């Protein structure tokens, strides 16, 4: 397992964990904003 593979694996795991934690808050925030103004 090369160094690049290890970094990619850690990046994927970190992104997955961050997404699973932050996604509900992100979508809730986006939903609340969409009620008053468009979100890009």
From Swiss-Prot:
Keywords: Auxin signaling pathway, Cytoplasm, Membrane, Nucleus, Transmembrane, Transmembrane helix. It is a single-pass membrane protein. The chain crosses the membrane at residues 7-29. Induction: Up-regulated by auxin. Expressed in cotyledons, hypocotyls, roots, newly developing leaves and shoot apical meristem. Not detected in flowers, siliques or mature leaves. It comes from the Eukaryota. GO terms for cellular component: cytoplasm; membrane; nucleus. One of its GO terms (biological process) is negative regulation of auxin mediated signaling pathway. It is found in: Cytoplasm; Nucleus; Membrane. Negative regulator of the auxin response. Knock-down mutants have no visible phenotype in the absence of exogenous auxin, but are more sensitive to auxin-induced inhibition of root elongation and initiation of lateral roots. This is Auxin-responsive endogenous peptide 1. It comes from Arabidopsis thaliana.
């Amino acid at each position: 397992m090369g160094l690049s593979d290890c970094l990619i694996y850690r990046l994927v795991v970190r992104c997955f964990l961050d997404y699973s934690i932050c996604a509900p808050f992100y979508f809730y925030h986006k939903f609340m904003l969409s009620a008053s103004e468009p979100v890009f």
